[in-house]
Amino acid sequence: MKIAIYLPGVFETKTDGYEHVDLSEIGSLDDAAYEEIFVDSCLDFIEQRDDFIKELVKKIRYAGQIIISGSDVYEISRAMMSKNLSLEETNSILYNGRYSISSVLDVVTRLQQLGLNILHKRVNDFKYTIIAERPAPNENPV
C-alpha cells in the first residue's frame, strides 16, 4: 500500500494512487506495512521533526521507499542573498507557520542514521526531494 501524508488546513497532497493519511494518524498505523510513503512539505510544520521521521521510517516495509520533499534553507538563503528573492518572500517561506526548516543534507543524514539507503536526492529552486529505501535486514551488514 502507498500512503501520502497531509497536514489538514496547512498542506493537502494532490497525489493519485496513494491513500491519504492525516499527519496526526501516523502513530496508529501498522509498522513495516507500507511499500511507499510520500511526505510533501509537512516536515517544516512539525515540532518534533526527528521523532516524526523516526516514526515514519518504522512504517516502511523492507524494500519499501519513502519520498520526502521540503524547502531547503540553504537555497532560500542563497536566493535572498543574490536578490532573486525579496526579504518579504523569504520571510513568508521561512516563517509562515513553520516550526523549523532544514536542508536536503540534514534530512539525508537523518535518514541514513535510521538505516535507510538514499536512492535519489535533488534540489530544484528552493525545494528538495529525497527518495530512500529501507533495506532488507540482511542487506545492511554491521
Language model features: what each stretch is:
Residues M1-D22:
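Short, hydrophobic beta-strand segments that form beta-sheet elements in well-ordered domains
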Residues T15-Y18, A33-E35, A63, G115:
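Short, well-ordered alpha-helix to beta-strand connector turns
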Residues E19, F38, I67:
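Conserved Rossmann-like nucleotide-binding pocket used by diverse enzymes
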Residues I26-D40:
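A short acidic, Gly/Pro-enriched loop at the edge of an enzyme's catalytic core
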Residues S41, E55-L56:
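Non-membrane alpha-helical segments in proteins
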Residues S41-R49:
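Di-metal (Zn2+ and/or Mg2+/Mn2+) metal-binding site signature of metallo-dependent hydrolases
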Residues I46-E47, I60-Y62:
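Helix-to-beta-strand junctions that scaffold the AdoMet/dcAdoMet cofactor pocket
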Residues D50, E55, Q65-V142:
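S-adenosyl-L-methionine-dependent methyltransferase catalytic module, highlighting the catalytic core
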